[in-house]
């Protein structure tokens, strides 16, 4: 008997990449899964496409069947399998990335196409222009990743792709490409949460990293403190109530007239080395808020006012500034960086205490995301982590910024435990509507740290990854 998966809203069910665990219908894929999971499976039937009232609108609905995997191999530590090979595709913001990763953790290839010129031209990410840039290079990036791995699509076990959070226009490019590859070569497809990928890539580089662990995920669009209980289950201890730290770094770099080709973070970090970090008095945000949430909008305002007071002209690049002007810019950069990281330190310290109350066995804290490549950030946070008798785990800078490796690895982790979807149709109409999740929480909020984020009050938010997986698990239990 076929059971309709009803735990998600109709808006989400269009492209639900985390349904109840599915078994592929094609015999060759069934053999593949039997090999990886050492399980014998029956061949189920699927009803995938269900048209809506509009003749030009098609909606994918996923069904689970009477044939289910109730228990799959799972390990709190990374589970390595040489036979698995996954292609990961990432287009959530301004980098077009693809990578091929083997189940044993070997990175076979990694390709990234940057939009640095567009960032300079528009002073940040322009969604429509970013989408067009992704579309121009996505085919080449994916092909280059396969070529560098000396593989073809036929050698892949699955395709993983970021479906959120991120910019809808950009996400769509990656999802469309992933579905075409998966459909043309009858490959399973795994939808990946962008922030979970930032956290889990640390398990690729640090084999001792087991659940549960703490994670601070810091980037241009996100500040997240999460407790990772196990794969797919997270508690959100803190988030940003307005702007993320990466956004503050980018704006500071722009106002100081720095070179934005490498993004604002590295530019501010480099200039800060020349400055006095205590010369400009900035207030630490949310100093008296006894939670783990972040706010960088006010610090941005303080920086802008300090720049105006020094009459710094952003149109004059720092390379052309006078000695005094350059020193003023360096002092502001250093002072900003110090206070921005102090804010991280205070919230991280409290979050670790909360996490240890919930999961006393925690041994590691992961720091990942684009801002985690900042050496000053790593140094300061390492002191906090060591004082709590934990070990800091930071992926190398190339895996902190957005990349295809983290998507492929996260896809591997979920694929091993049966969280994937069957191959999509080989052809889909141009107006096909995908389920993209631009605002998609990673975990459930911890009661002590509930956020009052302005950006979240009116935005359409999908159920968190954790709640989706938990709901399906409960539904399976009630039927067994």
From Swiss-Prot:
Transit peptide residues according to the UniProt entry: 1-86
Enzyme category, top tier: transferase
Expressing tissues: Expressed in young developing leaves, roots, flowers and siliques.
Alphabetical list of Gene3D superfamilies matching this protein: 3.30.420.40
Subcellular location: Mitochondrion inner membrane
Binding site for substrate: 217-221, 250, 265, 269, 373-374, 401
UniProt-recorded Gene Ontology molecular function terms: metal ion binding; N(6)-L-threonylcarbamoyladenine synthase activity
Residues bound to a divalent metal cation: 194, 198, 402
Broad class of where this protein is predominantly found: mitochondrion
Topology versus the membrane: Peripheral membrane protein
Keywords, ordered alphabetically: Acyltransferase, Membrane, Metal-binding, Mitochondrion, Mitochondrion inner membrane, Transferase, Transit peptide, tRNA processing
Keyword Transmembrane belongs to the record: no
Pfam families: TsaD
Cofactor(s) needed for function: a divalent metal cation
Purpose of the protein: Required for the formation of a threonylcarbamoyl group on adenosine at position 37 (t(6)A37) in mitochondrial tRNAs that read codons beginning with adenine. Probably involved in the transfer of the threonylcarbamoyl moiety of threonylcarbamoyl-AMP (TC-AMP) to the N6 group of A37. Involved in mitochondrial genome maintenance. May have a role in embryonic development in plants.
Protein family membership: Belongs to the KAE1 / TsaD family.
Annotated protein name in UniProt: Probable tRNA N6-adenosine threonylcarbamoyltransferase, mitochondrial
Naturally occurring in which organism (per UniProt): Arabidopsis thaliana
Gene (UniProt): GCP1
